[in-house]
Amino acid sequence: MLDIKFLRSNPEIVKQNIKNKFQDEKLPLVDEVIELDLRNREIKQEVEALRAEKNKSSKEIGAMMAQKKFEEAEVLKKKVSESAGRIEELSVEEKEVEEKIKKIMMTIPNIIDPSVPIGKDDSENVELERFGEPVVPDFEIPYHTEIMEAFNGIDLDSARKVAGNGFDYLMGDIARLHSAVISYARDFMINRGFTYCIPPFMIRSNVVTGVMSFAEMDAMMYKIEGEDLYLIGTSEHSMIGKFINTQLTEEELPQTLTSYSPCFRKEKGAHGIEERGVYRIHQFEKQEMIVVCKPEESMEWYEKLWKNTVDLFRSMDIPVRTLECCSGDLADLKVKSVDVEAWSPRQKKYFEVGSCSNLGDAQARRLGIRVKGKDGNYFAHTLNNTVVAPPRMLIAFLENNLQADGSVKIPEVLRPYMGGNEKIEVKKK
């Protein structure tokens, strides 16, 4: 959410930003909120003047009563009563205007960083860098569910009977591999100085609207019936929410947390072969990282965060690349974002496995996350990044570590979490 003072002083910058994000339908909102803001300030000035006059008249009434000027006092009493009624009317209007302003301001997108490429959607994202050499083996790589089934490692049919499409039972070595990746990612981030945390898996609506747009909320979140609670779609929401309505000191910054949680999402995406299996599902687990920091440090942390994900994947022998998200692919609160994509030898292309975002002070403004500085208070900056989401990680891991005999090699870093095993073997049927 933008600072209303910034919008008031820089309407053309805000409008150009909206155009850069290809959201021209929101352009009229800028002028609308400026008019509402003007009316809001007029109301406050009128109320202030009326209260001052009311207070002055009240003192005069007391003096008149003492001097037995009862008729004059009655005239002033009537005037005070009229002022009180007008103040009440204006207070009602003020509340309505402020609600309208807040609603519009929650819709206007955050100002993107000047370095963000201008583009309409994810097809115009820009490749930044590749890490590791993509390899296509001289044998056929099966679809990921077929690889899992060879280890008796997934049961989609039973999950469909129990919960419907978009769920799975992971079994045996595949389930163990899933847990191994999560445990390794946890320790990886702890070793990089992050504090480990398991957050609430449900959050209230004021936290939801503090961390994302209404459109994102509607597309992602499951609401608990009869409760002001939503199942989290990612633990970053719960983790950022931890700081709601808090004032931190500069000495307490940065806050660097890594969190584990199950995640629940309504979204399914477009149908197609890559939508089968575990690529896009309703329930999955994830290791996340968030940072709350000073504004001047947020871009430095942004670089550190996505590099953590790259380093994690490379430690498991998985080639990756980074993509700079273009303006039209950025969610409304984001200032800058980079996707990390893993190499798929089966598809002979990269696919998304994580995303790192700098949200500037947008979430902090919505949630009231302030910092007490030497020269006054200011809003913190917040960032988030996927450490690893095992469903997609498993796809990349299995494809890149599959051997010609059907076994899967376990990289050295994962072996302590897999009982020391160097590979997992195909199960005999």
Summary of predicted features, one role per range:
Residues 1-134, 149, 153:
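N-terminal alpha-helical targeting/anchoring segments
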Residues 27, 130-429:
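TRNA-recognition modules of translation machinery and tRNA-sensing kinases, especially anticodon-binding
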